[in-house]
Amino acid sequence: MLQLSISHIIVLSLLIRIGFFLFGLYQDKYMTVKYTDIDYVVFSDAANYVYNGYSPYSRETYRYTPLLAWMLIPNCWGGQWSNFGKYIFMISDLITGIIILKLLSGISIAGKKLSTNKIIMLSSIWLLNPMVITISTRGSSESVLTVMIMLSLYYLINKKSIIASGFWLGLSIHFKIYPVIYLPSIMLYLSTSGTPFIDVPIVRWVNRTNIKFLITTLITIGAFNGIMYSIYGYEFLYNSYLYHLIRIDHRHNFSVYNVALYYKSALSEIAEASLGFFTGNMEKFVMLPQLSISALILPLLFARRDLISCIFIQTFAFVTFNKVITSQYFIWFLIFLPHYLAQSKLYSNKHMMKGIVALLLWIVSQGSWLYFAYQLEFLGISTFDNGLLFSSFFFYISNCWILSVFIDDLNNDL
């Protein structure tokens, strides 16, 4: 029987990514529906503006840090250089998988390290996952972000380097703001790593170690944001951060708020004002339960018990309650799933069926939404009132139940 090693799985994952990339070139050239993500076109256009001495925000719908456009300047050099960004994203995707392998190799359960077979099986959730591979080879930049986040955890857990970990988390928050929800978790995790300044309830969680981490993270965020603001001014702040607080995106959106925001986007200012303060500002208020659960309650419950598993559940909750959800967002929590399953009872024979039901429910609820979205986008059939509305609720309720399973599992209540 063929025995795979960790080196084999890395080489295999690289070859599969190359295969997907080459197929994408063929599909873009010969098929009606293109393989390359529209976001990659936006990134490339923004890079072209930078290359010619203009702001990346001259490209409408570019809502990212200028760093991304700077990274993709070689896209403008013509020929195969137009795929430079995809090479970066594929390499970042692979590096993320390698860091996952390293973190798994450091796990001990009852004093025993994970077996090589288990490490390979768990890391395959990322390295051999067709959804992960498709997203990076189509030209999504999420893998650049996942490298930063995983480097932060690697330096924190494996290397015990507070400054390096804080730097990478700060850079990831600059790159895309949502990783800020990990800051409370890491602060709580580090609360046991030093002598508290004052030994009184709650305040005793603050010590030299987590203050050092916090300061490093904030300095990194401030430095990168300060540089970008000095170059691009308010348009950087608005497009990179403020826009996402008021964003309304009714296409390709699994969110339970999808249909409501779609109809709201069609209202005149007068009609919108008549909705009342809360309903008229729905896109702002939906963040309250989302952040309360993902950035406050879950860290308080689980951060000191198992940091990466806590971050996994945080991210799953954040995506579930987000006002915009696309398939790319699933990448945000998939990077932590191998670590979570390594110590989860859902991976055991006794509870595996519950895990399988959760997986099937997650897939089926997505499939039902995609079916009605396909009818709307490609067949021109209006499915907003019935199909998309109910399938969005189905997806939301399914995710809430799955979240409760994860919480019970980590809380030893299965």
UniProtKB/Swiss-Prot annotation:
Subcellular location: Endoplasmic reticulum membrane
Main location class: endoplasmic reticulum
Listed GO biological process terms: fungal-type cell wall organization; GPI anchor biosynthetic process
Regions crossing the membrane: 6-26, 87-107, 119-139, 149-171, 183-203, 213-233, 282-302, 316-336, 356-376, 387-407
Pathway the protein takes part in: Glycolipid biosynthesis; glycosylphosphatidylinositol-anchor biosynthesis
Membrane topology category: Multi-pass membrane protein
Principal EC category: transferase
Record-listed E.C. numbers: 2.4.1.-
Keyword set, alphabetical order: Cell wall biogenesis/degradation, Endoplasmic reticulum, Glycosyltransferase, GPI-anchor biosynthesis, Membrane, Transferase, Transmembrane, Transmembrane helix
Gene Ontology terms for molecular function: alpha-1,4-mannosyltransferase activity; glycolipid mannosyltransferase activity
Record-stated family: Belongs to the PIGM family.
Name the record gives this protein: GPI mannosyltransferase 1
